[in-house]
From Swiss-Prot:
Cystine pairings recorded for this chain: none
A Gene Ontology molecular function term of the record: ATP binding
Name this polypeptide is given: Uncharacterized MCM-type protein MJECL13
Residues reported in the UniProt entry to bind ATP: 315-322
Keyword Transmembrane helix: no
GO cellular component: MCM complex
Length: 602
């Protein structure tokens, strides 16, 4: 970290012309044309690369330096906007400092009243409060009115009139913004050996609340006295910017060699099938389409503006559904729970009222739903009707309420992979009855699943011999080493042999989640034609259309493509038709009829 004093007037003289050009050519073209009081984030890393080194250093030298630079940039931006005929205000946030300025949490006490940047994981978060950010003042002498915008949590409430110099009186609060308190823990294992540095308190003002996850925080270390006469201070980080880190940036380490190998194997046309066999070995599930669908769900657990892919597996008792779900739960960002043994508060746990510097308010701590970044695997889904019903809002609204009054909610943006046995004698499917009537789940929940797959345990000599052989090999192998052909395979890519095992699969999934393929006009036409044809002869709804779109994007993402093509759509259609023919086929009418999902009153 920089710990130097800079003459701000010299910094202004050195950079004024250069900064005006940057604002005019780079900043203003990217502003929203309608928003007033827009928050504009300026990357200090970018400014440093453009030659504003001393300007960046001066923001780090002291809290005064930070606010002087920020206010100066706001002033220059306002001037340039007025020259172009726009009369609006923007709130500048200086963030994204270069990596060399990043510190560990144990170093925070050494940077009081300075800007810091650090990574951490949220272990506790308050429900959002509101903080007044714009006050209205009136001068008792001359009667003039002034609006004052407070951009930080600590300020001097003495406001003076610009005309008569008299002290102005507070009249009203004009505007509010969300306020949250976060307790953040160091990502490194060594953090457990330290006290106050281990769990710093972060005060954050922003539109979007945070409850769980790995975050990168840029903020100012402030000292708050425990009482008016106390010489003991609490250290608070006043957050300037909070950036949520994706799974790929926090839970797994991808080397350059890993990325090269991932891109190489992605060129194979059968890469999805290969990875699906590693994710769920055919010994656990012999349905190749089901294995492929579950793999695709891991790669695209949540798609912005489209939604998530939810899957229900209904397995006979001979299928080890728990082993399948636990295996998938080991992928970074995923979680596994058995809903039959779960308590309601474990889904999302609120604290009792907790006292702190600000007073008493509820905080969220614990809960498997908010901290799941990918797919939540739920076993025995039809064994706890109360919790299953409570989860319906997580399926539909992407939130989960944590109290009876539904006042407090936590995010639930993960996808769901649920599994259960059929509610029949001996947990075996009755061939004389429809699948939908044997699941034992109400239509309220069933309609939230994009795909429902029955998995039967049918005796097969070759498969049973393979299962027995694998079990014997595991017993013989005392060192618990991986078995080639079962636990890993070697694939040929341009004459090079690359090992694909579960560790490689996890890295592939994490990397592919960063890909955002686009949908072309040809793809839209193909999906529309399929939907029109299905509506002519069968009964499906827009939900199935949306599922095909999500699956098509997920297939393209699994192949690391920039655009979705017709082959991806074909694979998506094959997957959804596999589900529709097995679960919602009406033999009396001879058609696919999804209305069967809504008739189930179990």
């Amino acid at each position: 970290m920089i710990n130097m004093c800079y003459n701000f007037e010299n910094v202004k003289k050195a950079y004024e012309d250069q900064l005006k050009n940057y604002i005019k050519n780079s900043l203003i073209p990217n502003l929203s044309s309608h928003a007033n009081n827009e928050v504009v984030k300026i990357s200090m890393k970018k400014l440093a690369n453009l030659g504003f080194g001393y300007l960046v250093d001066s923001t780090l030298s002291s809290i005064t330096g930070y606010y002087k630079v920020r206010d100066w940039i706001e002033e220059l931006l306002k001037e340039e906007l007025q020259k172009s005929g726009e009369n609006k205000c923007c709130n500048i946030v200086l963030c994204d400092y270069p990596e060399e300025f990043e510190i560990s949490m144990r170093e925070i006490p050494y940077y009081v009243n300075k800007v810091v940047k650090f990574n951490g994981v949220i272990i506790s978060a308050s429900y959002p409060c509101v903080l007044s950010k714009k006050h209205l003042y009136i001068c008792p002498k001359c009667g003039r009115i002034k609006e004052v915008y407070f951009s930080e949590l600590f300020w001097d409430d003495k406001v003076f009139c610009e005309f008569c110099g008299g002290k102005m009186e507070f009249a009203n609060v004009m505007d509010y913004e969300n306020f949250q308190e976060l307790v953040v823990q160091d990502l490194s294992d060594e953090s457990e050996y330290y006290g106050i540095e281990k769990n710093p308190i972060v005060w954050y003002c922003g539109a979007k609340p945070y409850y769980f996850g790995h975050v990168k925080i840029t903020g100012i270390v402030r000292e708050v006295p425990r009482s008016s006469k106390s010489r003991i201070y609490e250290l608070i980080v006043q957050a300037i910017n909070v950036e949520k880190l994706g799974v790929e940036k926090s839970l797994i380490n991808l080397t350059e060699e890993d990325v090269k190998n991932i891109k190489k194997v992605a060129k194979r046309g059968d890469i999805i099938d290969i990875l699906a066999d590693i994710l769920i070995p055919p010994l656990l599930c012999d349905d190749a389409i089901v294995r492929k669908a579950i793999l695709i769900q891991q790669i695209a657990p949540y798609l912005e503006d489209i939604g998530k892919i939810n899957i229900l597996l209904v397995t006979e008792v001979g299928i080890d559904k728990t082993a399948i779900l636990k295996r998938i739960g080991n992928i970074p960002g995923n979680n596994f729970i058995n809903i039959a043994a779960l308590k309601e508060e474990e889904l999302a746990t609120p604290y009792d009222k907790r006292s702190n510097i600000l007073g008493k308010f509820y905080t969220v701590c614990g809960g498997v739903i908010p901290r799941t970044l990918g797919v939540l695997c739920i076993d025995d889904f039809n064994e706890n009707n109360k919790l299953s019903t409570k989860l319906s809002e997580a399926f539909e609204r992407n939130v989960l309420t944590t109290n009876k009054g539904s006042f407090y909610c936590v995010p639930a943006e993960c996808s769901f992979l649920c599994a259960c046995y059929p509610k029949t004698k001996f947990r075996k499917f009755d061939q004389k009855k429809s699948i939908i009537k044997q699941i034992g789940i109400s239509s309220i929940l069933l309609k939230n699943f994009d795909l429902i797959f029955p998995i039967r345990d049918i005796p097969d000599k070759d498969r049973d011999e393979e299962v027995a052989k694998y079990i014997f090999l595991k017993y013989i192998n005392s060192d618990n080493e991986e078995i080639e052909g079962y636990d890993y395979v070697f694939v040929d890519v341009g004459g090079e042999k690359i090992k694909i095992d579960f560790e490689f699969l996890k890295k592939y999934v994490v990397y592919s989640r960063q890909i955002t393929p686009k949908i072309t006009d040809e793809v839209i036409e193909k999906i529309s034609n399929w939907y029109d044809e299905m509506r002519k002869n069968h009964y499906i709804t827009a939900k199935q259309l949306n599922t095909v779109i999500k699956l098509s994007i997920a297939v393209a993402r699994a192949k690391l493509k920039e655009c979705v093509d017709e082959d991806d759509v074909k694979e998506a259609i094959d997957i959804i038709m596999h589900y529709l023919k097995q679960v919602v086929y009406n033999p009396k009418k001879g058609i696919i009829d999804v209305i069967l999902l809504y008739k189930n009153k179990t």
